[in-house]
Amino acid sequence: MKGAKSKAETRSTKLSVTKKPAKGAKGAAKDPNKPKRPSSAFFVFMEDFRVTYKEEHPKNKSVAAVGKAGGEKWKSLSDSEKAPYVAKADKRKVEYEKNMKAYNKKLEEGPKEDEESDKSVSEVNDEDDAEDGSEEEEDDD
Protein backbone atom coordinates (compact mmCIF):
# COMPACT_ATOMS: atom_id res chain seq x y z
CA MET A 1 0.00 0.00 0.00
CA LYS A 2 2.51 2.55 -1.05
CA GLY A 3 1.22 6.08 -1.37
CA ALA A 4 -1.66 5.60 1.05
CA LYS A 5 -2.03 8.42 3.56
CA SER A 6 -2.94 8.03 7.19
CA LYS A 7 -5.89 9.91 8.66
CA ALA A 8 -3.55 12.35 10.37
CA GLU A 9 -1.82 13.18 7.08
CA THR A 10 -5.11 13.80 5.27
CA ARG A 11 -6.33 16.03 8.09
CA SER A 12 -3.20 18.13 7.98
CA THR A 13 -3.54 18.69 4.24
CA LYS A 14 -7.15 19.76 4.66
CA LEU A 15 -6.18 22.26 7.33
CA SER A 16 -3.55 23.84 5.14
CA VAL A 17 -6.11 25.06 2.61
CA THR A 18 -6.11 28.84 2.49
CA LYS A 19 -9.40 30.59 2.07
CA LYS A 20 -9.78 33.70 0.00
CA PRO A 21 -11.45 36.72 1.61
CA ALA A 22 -15.02 37.50 0.68
CA LYS A 23 -15.50 39.42 -2.57
CA GLY A 24 -16.75 42.61 -0.92
CA ALA A 25 -14.13 42.62 1.84
CA LYS A 26 -11.65 44.80 -0.04
CA GLY A 27 -14.21 47.28 -1.34
CA ALA A 28 -14.19 50.95 -0.52
CA ALA A 29 -15.71 52.09 2.74
CA LYS A 30 -19.38 53.03 2.53
CA ASP A 31 -20.24 56.70 2.61
CA PRO A 32 -22.59 57.40 5.53
CA ASN A 33 -24.09 60.35 3.62
CA LYS A 34 -25.16 58.20 0.67
CA PRO A 35 -28.97 57.79 0.50
CA LYS A 36 -30.23 54.36 1.46
CA ARG A 37 -31.93 52.26 -1.18
CA PRO A 38 -35.73 52.32 -1.04
CA SER A 39 -37.79 49.43 0.28
CA SER A 40 -39.45 47.07 -2.17
CA ALA A 41 -43.24 46.69 -2.22
CA PHE A 42 -42.91 43.55 -0.07
CA PHE A 43 -40.98 45.39 2.64
CA VAL A 44 -43.49 48.24 2.60
CA PHE A 45 -46.17 45.58 3.12
CA MET A 46 -44.15 44.00 5.94
CA GLU A 47 -43.99 47.33 7.81
CA ASP A 48 -47.78 47.28 8.11
CA PHE A 49 -48.01 43.51 8.55
CA ARG A 50 -45.63 43.45 11.53
CA VAL A 51 -47.85 45.89 13.44
CA THR A 52 -51.03 43.88 12.85
CA TYR A 53 -49.26 40.56 13.51
CA LYS A 54 -47.94 41.78 16.88
CA GLU A 55 -51.45 42.89 17.87
CA GLU A 56 -52.93 39.50 16.95
CA HIS A 57 -50.03 37.44 18.40
CA PRO A 58 -48.55 39.42 21.32
CA LYS A 59 -46.70 36.42 22.79
CA ASN A 60 -44.94 35.46 19.56
CA LYS A 61 -41.56 37.22 19.49
CA SER A 62 -39.98 35.12 16.73
CA VAL A 63 -38.75 37.17 13.78
CA ALA A 64 -38.79 34.05 11.62
CA ALA A 65 -42.45 33.38 12.40
CA VAL A 66 -43.43 36.94 11.50
CA GLY A 67 -41.43 36.75 8.27
CA LYS A 68 -42.92 33.41 7.30
CA ALA A 69 -46.47 34.55 8.00
CA GLY A 70 -45.85 37.80 6.10
CA GLY A 71 -44.44 35.96 3.11
CA GLU A 72 -47.42 33.62 2.95
CA LYS A 73 -49.85 36.53 3.25
CA TRP A 74 -48.00 38.48 0.50
CA LYS A 75 -48.17 35.48 -1.85
CA SER A 76 -51.89 35.12 -1.24
CA LEU A 77 -52.64 38.79 -2.05
CA SER A 78 -53.96 39.65 -5.50
CA ASP A 79 -52.32 42.32 -7.65
CA SER A 80 -55.08 44.79 -6.77
CA GLU A 81 -54.44 44.19 -3.04
CA LYS A 82 -50.70 44.70 -3.57
CA ALA A 83 -51.25 47.94 -5.54
CA PRO A 84 -51.09 50.38 -2.58
CA TYR A 85 -47.78 48.86 -1.44
CA VAL A 86 -46.38 48.96 -4.97
CA ALA A 87 -47.44 52.62 -5.25
CA LYS A 88 -45.71 53.47 -1.95
CA ALA A 89 -42.57 51.64 -3.06
CA ASP A 90 -42.58 53.51 -6.40
CA LYS A 91 -42.97 56.82 -4.57
CA ARG A 92 -40.00 55.97 -2.35
CA LYS A 93 -37.99 54.93 -5.41
CA VAL A 94 -38.63 58.28 -7.12
CA GLU A 95 -37.57 60.10 -3.94
CA TYR A 96 -34.44 57.93 -3.74
CA GLU A 97 -33.51 58.66 -7.35
CA LYS A 98 -33.92 62.39 -6.68
CA ASN A 99 -31.72 62.13 -3.58
CA MET A 100 -29.11 60.10 -5.49
CA LYS A 101 -28.92 62.74 -8.24
CA ALA A 102 -28.30 65.41 -5.61
CA TYR A 103 -25.76 63.17 -3.86
CA ASN A 104 -23.87 62.41 -7.09
CA LYS A 105 -23.90 66.10 -8.04
CA LYS A 106 -22.42 66.93 -4.64
CA LEU A 107 -19.71 64.28 -5.17
CA GLU A 108 -18.82 65.68 -8.60
CA GLU A 109 -18.37 69.16 -7.15
CA GLY A 110 -15.77 67.75 -4.80
CA PRO A 111 -14.97 68.39 -1.17
CA LYS A 112 -14.67 72.16 -0.83
CA GLU A 113 -15.18 72.37 2.93
CA ASP A 114 -12.97 69.41 3.88
CA GLU A 115 -9.66 70.66 2.46
CA GLU A 116 -7.81 69.99 5.72
CA SER A 117 -9.41 66.58 6.21
CA ASP A 118 -6.54 64.93 4.31
CA LYS A 119 -4.36 65.41 7.37
CA SER A 120 -4.62 62.88 10.14
CA VAL A 121 -5.74 63.94 13.59
CA SER A 122 -2.25 63.50 15.00
CA GLU A 123 -0.77 65.83 12.37
CA VAL A 124 -3.32 68.49 13.22
CA ASN A 125 -2.62 68.07 16.94
CA ASP A 126 1.15 68.24 16.32
CA GLU A 127 0.71 71.54 14.51
CA ASP A 128 -1.35 72.93 17.39
CA ASP A 129 1.27 71.81 19.93
CA ALA A 130 4.08 73.42 17.94
CA GLU A 131 2.27 76.77 17.95
CA ASP A 132 1.71 76.72 21.74
CA GLY A 133 5.36 76.11 22.59
CA SER A 134 6.92 73.22 24.43
CA GLU A 135 5.95 73.83 28.04
CA GLU A 136 5.40 70.13 28.76
CA GLU A 137 8.97 69.09 27.95
CA GLU A 138 10.65 71.23 30.64
CA ASP A 139 10.36 68.65 33.44
CA ASP A 140 14.05 67.87 34.22
CA ASP A 141 13.74 66.88 37.92
From Swiss-Prot:
Keywords: Cytoplasm, DNA-binding, Nucleus, Phosphoprotein. Induction: Up-regulated by cold stress, but down-regulated by drought and salt stress. Expressed in lateral roots, root tips, stems, cotyledons, leaves and flowers (excluding ovary and pedicels). SUPFAM superfamilies: HMG-box (SSF47095). Binds preferentially double-stranded DNA. Belongs to the HMGB family. This is High mobility group B protein 3. It comes from Arabidopsis thaliana. The gene is HMGB3.
